[in-house]
């Protein structure tokens, strides 16, 4: 339950002048000359102070004969829900084909650009621009997966033209649209299998860097898993440089005090990359819960989505999804087996004690 606060009328007026969204739910203000009452954060033009009166809630303002503002809808009981509704509306506007600027978006949801940007990021964990880019990337993937042409897919995703897409092609899909459509066609990926302390390991590398580190017990299963990631990629020869890279990866997997300095080719959605980036900040020897990880990226309600992002990790140990446990501290699922997860955590705990 929200704790009641005692504000003077002068303090309330300052909140109205600042259009402070944090004051929503604390009180409403009414304007005698218009007969309308509003939330403190309402974007309507300010009235003169002498024409403004304050009420504890919408019920009192209604009882005094005032009408609710159609713009800020102060009669809604839950101010937090009201703000969430605005962000939800902003998300739907960002998902339209026509790009929208922050200023235009703020105007449509009746907020200042500054407050919208801050509240949007606090609610979704992403900026409005990043949300729009992630949505475009999703639509592009879906369209390409359906067999649509590259040009049609680019336009359907909301890019104004092909050149706008190609300037951001690498960060949108991690490869060209044509390569994505054909399962990584013409994408050179080399791989090697080796033993490590955790069993068999498959290390794969693209032109951009290490793109997969997979663990298992059966070579055929590991190769099949890689082929599902890049079904049409070319199998590049394993040259001496790549063999050295494989040795560095194995050394890093076997000894956690040997950090991997090789470039990584991390491919995933904007949300997945956000989760994976947060995972890499968890210190060796420590664990967090899925809820704590969701909180860390600013999305406390996205616990299941966070767990799915952990399960989609393609770079075992380097992106340490094994450091995420249930809320009660017990081990949950792990892409490469719960027993490996337990082994990794024991090893890291022992290393920290030395």
From Swiss-Prot:
Names of required cofactors: Zn(2+)
Active site: 38, 321
Annotated binding of Zn(2+), by residue: 38, 42, 69, 72
Site feature location: Cleavage: 128-129, 178-179
Cofactor, free-text remark: Binds 1 zinc ion per subunit.
Domains: entry comment: Consists of two domains. The 20 kDa N-terminal domain repairs the Sp diastereomer of methylphosphotriesters and, in its methylated form, binds DNA in a sequence-specific manner. The 19 kDa C-terminal domain repairs the mutagenic lesions O6-methylguanine. Each domain retains its activity when separated form the other.
The gene coding this protein: ada
Family listed: In the C-terminal section; belongs to the MGMT family.
PANTHER family: BIFUNCTIONAL TRANSCRIPTIONAL ACTIVATOR_DNA REPAIR ENZYME ADA (PTHR10815:SF14), METHYLATED-DNA--PROTEIN-CYSTEINE METHYLTRANSFERASE (PTHR10815)
Induction: Up-regulated by methylated Ada itself in response to the exposure to alkylating agents.
Domain HTH araC/xylS-type, chain residue ranges per copy: 85-183
InterPro entries (alphabetical): Ada-like_dom_sf, Ada_DNA_repair_Zn-bd, Bifunct_regulatory_prot_Ada, Homeodomain-like_sf, HTH_AraC, HTH_AraC-typ_CS, MethylDNA_cys_MeTrfase_AS, MethylDNA_cys_MeTrfase_DNA-bd
Feature: DNA-binding region: 102-121
Name by which UniProt lists this protein: Bifunctional transcriptional activator/DNA repair enzyme Ada
Organism: Escherichia coli (strain K12)
Chain spans, region Methylphosphotriester-DNA--protein-cysteine methyltransferase: 1-171
């Amino acid at each position: 339950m929200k704790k009641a606060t005692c504000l003077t009328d002068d303090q309330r007026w300052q909140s109205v002048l600042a259009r402070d969204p944090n004051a929503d739910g604390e009180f409403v203000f009414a304007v005698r000359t218009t007969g309308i009452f509003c939330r403190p954060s309402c974007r309507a033009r300010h009235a003169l102070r002498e024409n403004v009166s304050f009420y504890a809630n919408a019920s009192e303002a209604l009882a005094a004969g005032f009408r609710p503002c159609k713009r800020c809808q102060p009669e809604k009981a839950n101010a937090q829900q009201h703000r969430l509704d605005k962000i939800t509306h902003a998300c739907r506007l960002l998902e339209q084909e026509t790009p929208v600027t922050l200023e235009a978006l703020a105007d449509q949801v009746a907020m200042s650009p500054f407050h919208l940007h801050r509240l949007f990021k606090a609610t979704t964990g992403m900026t409005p621009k990043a949300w729009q880019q992630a949505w475009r990337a999703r639509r592009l993937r879906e369209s390409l997966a359906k067999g649509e042409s590259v040009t049609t897919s680019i336009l359907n995703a909301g890019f104004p033209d092909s050149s706008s897409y190609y300037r951001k092609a690498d960060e949108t899909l991690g490869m060209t649209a044509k390569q994505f459509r054909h399962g990584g066609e013409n994408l050179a990926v080399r791989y090697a299998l080796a033993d490590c302390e955790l069993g068999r390991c498959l290390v794969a590398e693209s032109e951009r860097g290490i793109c997969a580190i997979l663990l298992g017990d059966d070579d055929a299963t590991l190769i099949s898993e890689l082929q599902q990631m890049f079904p049409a990629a070319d199998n590049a020869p394993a040259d001496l440089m790549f063999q050295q890279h494989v040795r560095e990866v194995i050394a890093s997997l076997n000894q956690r005090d040997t950090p991997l300095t090789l470039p990584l080719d991390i491919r995933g959605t904007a949300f997945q990359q956000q989760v994976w980036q947060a995972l890499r900040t968890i210190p060796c020897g420590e664990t967090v819960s899925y809820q704590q990880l969701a909180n860390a990226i600013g999305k406390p309600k996205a616990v299941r989505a966070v767990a799915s992002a952990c399960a989609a990790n393609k770079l075992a140990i380097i992106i340490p999804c094994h450091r995420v446990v249930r809320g009660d501290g017990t081990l949950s699922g792990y892409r490469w087996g719960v027993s490996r997860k337990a082994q990794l955590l024991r090893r890291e705990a022992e290393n920290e004690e030395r």
